[in-house]
């Protein structure tokens, strides 16, 4: 079945390693890891395929003050990455699926299975030996997480938190917060070992832990390729963005 792609007039040069597959990504360590994760999965099926990760700073990276819950379902983190594909500088863009708006600038051609949908509460080490304070200072971003934290810790002081995973953990170390909410998938992808964590109960974001791949050209070829390689877990998920 995969032999057909070696004869595909568009895909064959990628599959045979004649030209690099150019992947667009945000500049954060997590985003770059996610792009390489996608590349490795394709290389499992096409060993000669190789690629380049081309990074871009997004509006969401530059603006560290706007609360994330106020820009949900926008292209805050995705539009600038998709523009690299639209302009022909990249072939595909790799996103955290939950960053996508309902109508992204590029076509969603694949959505991966979630490596872990759960949210976790990461707290200061001192709370291993003493109870949480009644006015627990918790950093989180989305409305969904805020609602969950409010139900679990009604007296908590919930504050917006922005930045990369590393930035957020640094704020916790600096005691700006008693605890912060994170996606366990992000922690796992970065290979971090955080001993002071609590797994939070559902509901979780339906796209948490998933990657979304977008493109603007040769859509049918890309969609078929990712389905054949079983990188797209469920084709029905693509209809959410169509």
UniProtKB/Swiss-Prot annotation:
One Pfam family this sequence matches? Porphobil_deam
Q: Does the keyword Transferase apply?
A: yes
Protein family (similarity comment): Belongs to the HMBS family.
Name by which UniProt lists this protein: Probable porphobilinogen deaminase
Instruction: State the GO CC annotations.
Output: cytoplasm
Keyword presence, Transferase: yes
Q: Which reaction does it catalyse?
A: 4 porphobilinogen + H2O = hydroxymethylbilane + 4 NH4(+)
Give the UniProt keywords, A-Z: Porphyrin biosynthesis, Transferase
What the entry lists under PANTHER family is as follows: PORPHOBILINOGEN DEAMINASE (PTHR11557:SF0)
